[in-house]
Structures are given as structure tokens and as C-alpha cells.
Regions:
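Catalytic core of membrane glycerolipid acyltransferases/transacylases, capturing the structured
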Residues: 3-52
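Short catalytic-loop micro-motif centered on adjacent basic/acidic residues
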Residues: 1-2, 110
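Non-catalytic C-terminal accessory region of glycerolipid acyltransferases
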Residues: 55, 59-191
């Protein structure tokens, strides 16, 4: 299952809740720092976002994909940003989930989570980028963004599965990732 990543925390919780209503046996590829959330760590597959993934970490990812369970991913790997046109959208989706879907014969279900962070969050991201600061400073403000959403409702829309067999040689993995990204954002027009 692949989803956009508009909120950076609450969207993951909403994603897990939506899937958990149908299946309890799932795992979620997440930033390895989230393993510190003890109650949720059994559901998490760690991904090192600041360095290279060690061989042992890659083995854990492959072992998880080999199981007959849903794997939840945010293919962008980072929280959505405000683009020059004013739209809140994910950055480029990484192709690895397409390769894993092919290798482990897992269909991919597009999931759209609605929502956005504060203007301050997006302004920080924009200024950091303009100033050439590579460190993802806005990540440190995501817990605050989560608490700003107190008493709000997060809408999660689940699309139709795309068979792993559809990810053929007619497109390269990057193009298939873009295809899934487009299918995900098209779910905004579903309701």
C-alpha cells in the first residue's frame, strides 16, 4: 500500500488505523527514529533516512516483504511540501516500492490522506531550501504540527489495487512510481 505523506506523523497514524480496520497483520516502512515509539515499534520496518541502510536493515526489509502481509509505504520518503503553484504535494516518489512489489508479487493499493501542515512549516521548508541548508530542519517541528491537528478529522481514501504484474517493462520503475503517485492524487476526485 502506498500513500502520499502530507502531515508527517498524523497521516501515518491515520493510514495505520484505516488499514487496521481491515487487517491487523501489516507493517510500515518508517524512519528508524520512530522505533523509539515502543507501542508501535512491532509494526515498523526501520529505514535509515540520514545515512546508508546497513545490510542487516535491508535484510529486515526484504524479510518483511516476503511475508504474506500488507506493507505500508510513503514512497516520497519525506513530508509533502508546498510547491510554487501553491499546491501541497509529495516530492518525487522513490521507485523501490515498485521493485519490491515485482520481486515479492505484491499488489499496490494507492491511498490518499488529506491534510496539510501550517503555513509556518512550509515557509521554513522554502527558506531552508533557498538558503541552501541541506538539513531537513522542518522535520523537528513535525511533533508540533501533529498537536496542532488536535480534534481534527483526517480523511483517508483507499483506491483499487494495481497488480504487481502490471508493473511490466512498458515503463521503467521511476515511471511506474510516478504512475502510482498520479493514481493516488486522482483519488481526491473520487468523492
Amino acid at each position: 500500500m502506498s500513500s502520499n505523506h502530507p502531515l508527517g506523523g498524523l497521516d501515518g497514524i491515520a493510514f495505520m488505523k484505516a488499514v487496521g480496520e481491515v487487517r491487523e497483520d501489516f507493517q510500515f516502512l518508517v524512519n528508524d527514529i520512530l522505533l523509539n515509539i515502543g507501542n508501535l515499534s512491532p509494526l515498523f520496518i526501520p529505514v535509515n533516512k540520514v545515512g546508508a541502510n546497513a545490510r542487516a536493515a535491508l535484510k529486515i526489509i526484504d524479510e518483511s516483504y516476503a511475508k504474506d502481509i500488507p506493507i505500508l509505504v510513503f514512497p516520497a520518503g519525506l513530508v509533502s511540501r508546498k510547491m510554487d503553484d501553491g499546491k501541497i504535494t509529495d516530492l518525487v516518489w522513490q521507485k523501490s516500492f515498485i521493485g519490491k512489489a515485482r520481486r515479492y508479487k505484491k499488489d499496490v493499493i494507492p491511498v490518499l490522506v488529506a491534510g496539510e501542515n501550517s503555513k509556518w512549516f512550509y515557509n521554513l521548508s522554502r527558506w531552508r531550501t533557498k538558503l541552501g541548508i541541506k538539513a531537513n530542519l522542518e522535520m523537528f517541528y513535525l511533533p508540533g504540527e501533529l498537536f496542532k491537528k488536535k480534534n481534527s478529522t483526517i480523511k483517508v481514501t483507499i483506491g483499487k489495487a494495481v497488480s504487481y504484474a502490471d508493473f511490466d517493462k512498458s515503463r521503467n520503475p521511476n515511471e511506474w512510481a510516478m504512475f502510482m503517485r498520479e493514481k493516488t492524487y486522482a483519488l481526491a476526485n473520487k468523492n
